[in-house]
Amino acid sequence: MKRSIVFIYSLVILLLSVGFIDAFKISIENHIKLSDDSSYQIGTGIYDITGPGAETNMMGYAMPGQITGGIHFRQRARAFVFIDSEGNRAVYVSTDSCMIFQEVKIQVIQDLQEIFGPTLYTHDNVLLSGTHTHSGPAGFSEYALYGITALGFYKKNFDTICDGIVQAIVKAHKSVQPARMLTQQGELWNSNINRSPYAYDNNPEEEKAMYDANVDKNMTVIRIEDMSGNPFAAISFFGVHCTSMNNTNHLISGDNKGYASYLWEKHANGQSSLPGTGPFIAAFGQSNEGDVSPNTRGPTCRDGKPCDYKTSTCNGKVEECWALGPGTDGDMFESTQIIGGNQFNKALELFNNATIQVSGKIQYRHTWKPFTNVSVEAPYNSGVEGATTCRGAMGYSFAGGTTDGPGAFNFIQGDNSTTNPFWNFIGGIIAKPTPQQTACQAPKPILIDVGMVEPIPWVPDVMPLQIITLGQIVLVAVPGEFTTMSGRRLRNTVREIIGQSIENPIVLIAGLANTYSGYIATFEEFQVQRYEGASTVFGPHTLGAYQQEFANLAQSIVDGSQADPGTFPRNMSGHTPFFLPPVIVDVAPKFDDFGDIYTDVSTTTPYSINQTVTVIFYGANLRNNFMTESSFLTVDQLQSNGQWTTILNDGDWDTKLYWKMHDLGFSLITVDWTISPITQPGTYRITHSGYAKKNPFSDNLTFYQGISSNFNVQ
């Protein structure tokens, strides 16, 4: 099988090239009995998960040419440990990553159990959720579909993500303190739209009439404070894609949710605080964002005319139809600021007005469910007798992309045909759909029969289903992207059952959690086969199966019974190769060294507010060392005592670091600093640090640093 995967990856590379384009035990006795059911112990932690800033395909848009070329601001894992008065505990982690893959969750649990033992933190009580930023490095899944454009499995990136999540949880574990939670809900408008209204409109009229909009406008915020009322953390849930940064971006970014976290943590910790240092931690968790875009100006053709409503095309071409964010002329950086800022401002408002006391037990249920042949019974089968899920398959519209990022090839949403030779060929050599598979997936025209590949399918087929209750807050961890209406139906299903034992439950979708299985559209949305329907892997009854199985988990909480643990998924370790060549050697020009200046700052004319300071260094490949919990750059201010103080680093919004390979084979590192209005007048400098591989026959790396000339800000 490994040889066949190697063959397929090699073939993909060929086709693209020709234009087809701490290791110690920590005591677990860290909790005390609390006196009532609204008192908890809560700990928080944050850690860097930023991956390779050079030469690595980015996860989300599946665009072969979207390769990392620097860092806008770093990506982080934010962890929360909750313990109730009986000692029951649960963990919620929000990561600035596109999603959580099965392999990540399994590795994180293994690592936690090596530290804490086998029973404290398990698959049952640890929930990992991705924000769905499309501006992070790919290659952290061993399932082939999610690694084709990444050229396989990048273990160094995978390890960085897993280690960062574990360290965030360890920090949270060590910081638990008596605490309480308050919550508040409210509506946030002008921050999300439905990107597939044609599919949404296919849902029943009476169901649509129950809601004010075709996307969820509701935001839920959890305020976490100590027993004196001093807040130290917050979690927000709001469904919107992290696609404010489009597929022309090459800088690592947390997108709008990462920026919202950055804003709140700066607000709470002080503007002079450096990112990721706490103590206040704010997570902007993902929810049912499947058909929800942050590009609120909507899709238009490049000539200014509206895109076709059904197919999102312009003159029959998907690549001409783009949705723009609210930034000036659709500027993606400004759009990220606006949508992220809107989420922060609304969350802060709800946080400051939170009055609903969270009280009750911490409970959790988890099962591993094989999802390729689930019999779906009434009332979840959409009235179809004998309804089942199917082995995984991707439809034609999957390759068409969305208005947030049209596909690389001319597929059309809602169209069942293509003449594109690349995807026809790839789909043909993987597996031919059987008549049974074709019938099961109908009306989806199968492009890539990912579930029929033997012996290992190209997508996960055993789903981790999980519910965690924090008092009346119910977190439903879904392993994929539920559309707006799918999320509403699932919340209603869980609320109806769990409301038998929890008064006034607040049911929340925690999206892209624990593994990733594509999209989950409603039965009706599936029929029109836009992108979300074509990417609903297990067929038209996928949502019904999720409703049915989550109903069973909710019922087990009501009954006080244990959930069936289910079938643990296959071990994927070592199944997927990596075809990105390693860094062979770094070189600098003959009369220069790493860290020397290529283009310096202005030393004669002072800079002003809103101007951008630029300096270019001779550097090395950013893949050598990811500078985890550190920085490739600093902006330093000269103090009156003659010492330098770092005021910004590469985790800050105001800086950008670009990596580029010069034609002569050396790396150029460009650092931009846009001077914000809160910057104090004075003398400044910019530094760049990194590691160079000087010897092609050794893996040893050499640290280097470059420092700009001093310059003034007036």
UniProtKB/Swiss-Prot annotation:
Q: Which family does it belong to?
A: Belongs to the neutral ceramidase family.
Q: Where is the active site?
A: S293 (nucleophile)
| Pfam families assigned | Ceramidase_alk, Ceramidse_alk_C
Q: Which GO terms describe its molecular function?
A: N-acylsphingosine amidohydrolase activity
- Top enzyme class: hydrolase
Gene Ontology CC annotation, any one: extracellular region
Briefly state the protein's biological role: Hydrolyzes the sphingolipid ceramide into sphingosine and free fatty acid at an optimal pH of 3.0. Has no activity toward glycosphingolipids, such as GalCer and Galbeta1-3GalNAcbeta1-4(NeuAcalpha2-3)Galbeta1-4Glcbeta1-1'Cer or sphingomyelin.
* Signal peptide location: 1-23
Q: Does the keyword Glycoprotein apply?
A: yes
Name by which UniProt lists this protein = Neutral ceramidase A
Question: At which residues is glycosylation annotated?
Answer: N218, N246, N353, N373, N416, N571, N610, N700
Q: Which GO terms describe its biological process?
A: ceramide catabolic process; ceramide metabolic process; long-chain fatty acid biosynthetic process; sphingosine biosynthetic process
Q: What's in the misc comment field?
A: In contrast to other members of the family, it displays a highest activity at acidic and not neutral pH.
The protein's pH behavior is summarized as: Optimum pH is 3.0.
InterPro entries annotated for this entry? Answer: Ceramidase_alk, NCDase_C_sf, NEUT/ALK_ceramidase_C, NEUT/ALK_ceramidase_N
Name the gene for this chain.
dcd2A
Please provide the record's keywords in A-Z order: Glycoprotein, Hydrolase, Lipid metabolism, Secreted, Signal, Sphingolipid metabolism
EC number(s) stated in the UniProt entry for this protein: 3.5.1.23
Q: Where found, per UniProt?
A: Secreted
